[in-house]
From Swiss-Prot:
Protein name: Ketimine reductase mu-crystallin
Gene3D superfamilies named in the record: NAD(P)-binding Rossmann-like Domain, ornithine cyclodeaminase, domain 1
GO MF term set: structural constituent of eye lens; thiomorpholine-carboxylate dehydrogenase activity; thyroid hormone binding
Family per record: Belongs to the ornithine cyclodeaminase/mu-crystallin family.
Primary gene name: CRYM
Functional note: Catalyzes the NAD(P)H-dependent reduction of imine double bonds of a number of cyclic ketimine substrates, including sulfur-containing cyclic ketimines. Under physiological conditions, it efficiently catalyzes delta(1)-piperideine-2-carboxylate (P2C) and delta(1)-pyrroline-2-carboxylate (Pyr2C) reduction, suggesting a central role in lysine and glutamate metabolism. Additional substrates are delta(2)-thiazoline-2-carboxylate (T2C), 3,4-dehydrothiomorpholine-3-carboxylate (AECK), and (R)-lanthionine ketimine (LK) that is reduced at very low rate compared to other substrates.
Subunit structure: Homodimer. Binds the thyroid hormone triiodothyronine (T3); T3 binding inhibits enzymatic activity.
Catalytic EC class: oxidoreductase
The keyword NAD appears for this protein: yes
Top-level taxon of the source organism: Eukaryota
Location, primary (coarse class): cytoplasm
Single biological process term from Gene Ontology: thyroid hormone metabolic process
Binding site for NADPH: S91, H92, R119, A144, V146, Q147, N168, R169, T170, N173, T205, M206, V226, S292
Amino acid sequence: MSWSPAFLRSEDVERYLGSSSILLPALEKALANFSSGSEGGVVQPVRTVIPVAKHQGFLGIMPVYSASEDALTTKLVTFYEGMSPTSTAPSHQTTVLFFDPSNGSLLSIMDGNIITAKRTAAVSAIATKFLKPPSSEVLCILGAGVQAYSHYEIFKEQFSFKEVRIWNRTKKNAEKFAQTVKGDVRVCSSVQEAVTGADVIITVTMATKPILFGEWVKPGAHINAVGASRPDWRELDDEIMKNCVLYVDSREAALKESGDVILSGAEIFAELGEVVKGVKPAHREKTTVFKSLGMAVEDAVAAKLVYDSWSSGK
């Protein structure tokens, strides 16, 4: 009898995963397990990156096994910064391979773009829950791509901000964002205008040089730094990085992959999972940065939810 893995397209993943909020409990558990070392049962090497210099791209390979969920996955991600404006292919493309951990059989090949967008935003929401100032009224989003939309969705569900601002290098994309999402969003003409007085800042840009400067940031603000995922790319300047309390998803990955951390020489205070576990404090009263690089265990948690939902509905 022939057998082949289930192929789940982006619309399938969207249907079976639903709101990013459904991921929150499982992701908090996964973050805590990851930061528990061998006791947490997460086996996850740092992402392997294969440069494709000829075409200004790279292939990232992200395998993981999580004993708690009994989930075995590998995510493949490609990123091409030199994409032609006429190209119909997105700059980021991801695929998740979901295996049966008991025998190694490939159970499913999933579109990973929805998974990546939703799990990344959900982890930012977890960081914000722990680290944002007690009275947070103004949310600022820098960038207007896929991650901006996924972050806005879950942040509107989980928090009550009185004002939301957005900036994007191409202003028409910020205007499109404001017209598309539910709720009032103020489009700003500069980063400084957008971040001045903001309590929570989300950076989801394609920047390779700092765009956010410490002199503009309100003391005590919380920043979710999501872009700049290569060791020579940055979104935040030295003033922010050296004077903040710095949290990361993975110390090992941040010291290998994050230009914001490596080039500034900033000291990492804690992994987010350590805060979730309660072994490291959340310094709400200080300016905090959560540097998010994304982890394979986050993809595994989301992929398992998708697969279990799909298989139960067959």
